[in-house]
Amino acid sequence: MANTFVFSSESVGEGHPDKVADLISDSILDACLAYDKTSRVACETFVKSNVVVIGGEITIPKLQDKKTGKTKPIDEAFNVEKVIRDAIRHIGYTNDDDVFHADTVFINNYLTAQSADIAQGVDAKKADGKKTAEQGAGDQGLMFGFAADETEELMPAPVIFAHRLGRELTKIRKSGKVKWLRPDAKSQVSVRYVDGVATEIVNVVISTQHTADVAHKTIESFLIKNVIKKVLPAKLLTKNTEFLINPTGKFVIGGPQGDSGLTGRKIIVDSYGGWGRHGGGAFSGKDPSKVDRSAAYMG
C-alpha cells in the first residue's frame, strides 16, 4: 500500500511585519560589516503602527580608541536612522496613505555595546600550538541542515514553491505595472507525496495586501494566471488543485499597521518550511560569530 501524505509550507513577503523587522535588523548588520568586517552585531527590531524600535548589542572595533578605551557612538560609522528608513523604502512602504511610512516612522534606538563577558570568548586569539588565531562562538546552539533532490535549489518542494510565489508577487509589485498591489503578503503550498515523491499540488493560498479600489475577482484571476500558473510546475497542478486567493475577502490594512512585527519570528520560513528539525535560533541581525546563522548556513 502506498504511503501518501500532504505537506504544507508557507512563505511571507518582504512587507510582512516580521520580515520588515528582519530586513531592518539585517540592514543594520550590513552597515556595520561594511564599516568594519570584524563588527559584532546582535540587532533586534520591533515594528508596530508608525513605530520602529531597535535594540541589541553592537561592537565596532574601528570605533574604539585603544589608548583611552573609549568608544565613539555608532553614528560615527553610519546614520542608523537613514539605514532604517532606506530599508523600509526598499520594501515599498512609501504610499501616501501608509501609516507605516519610510519618511515618517518614529525610531527608538536602544543599541548598546556587546557584553565584555561574551566578547572575551568570541574575539580571535592564537591558541597554544596553533599557527593562526581561532575565533570563538558567541553562544551554544543547535543547528540542522540537509539537502533534498525535489528541486533545483536542493530544498523541499513545498517551501520552494511558496517562495517562488512570493518572489514573483514582489517582482510584479515593484515593476509598478500593477498599481493595486501593496507590500504585505503570504503564500502557502500543500503538496501530496506518494512513497516520498511529490505527485501533485493539492492547494495554493496567496494573501496579498491591496488598495481598496480593486475587486476581489480581479485579484483572484490575476494571481492565478500571472503568478501561480507562471511559477509552479504545470505537471503538479491538476483539475483538483484548489486556489485560495485572499480567502478572507479583503486585505487593505496590512504591514505593521495591521500587525506587530519582530525579528526572528519566521525561522521556519527562513529554513526548510517545517521539514526536518530546527534548533530555534533565528538568522537576521546576527554577525557570523553567532552560530545560529553561520552554522545553519554551512549545514
Descriptions of predicted regions:
Residues S8-S11, K82, A87-I253:
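Glycine-rich, mobile lid/loop segments that gate access to catalytic sites or pores
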Residues A2, K48-N50, T59, A148-D149, ...:
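Short connector loops/turns at beta-strand edges and beta->alpha or beta->beta junctions
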Residues I60, I228, L262-G299:
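Conserved mixed alpha/beta catalytic, RNA-binding, or beta-rich assembly cores of soluble enzyme
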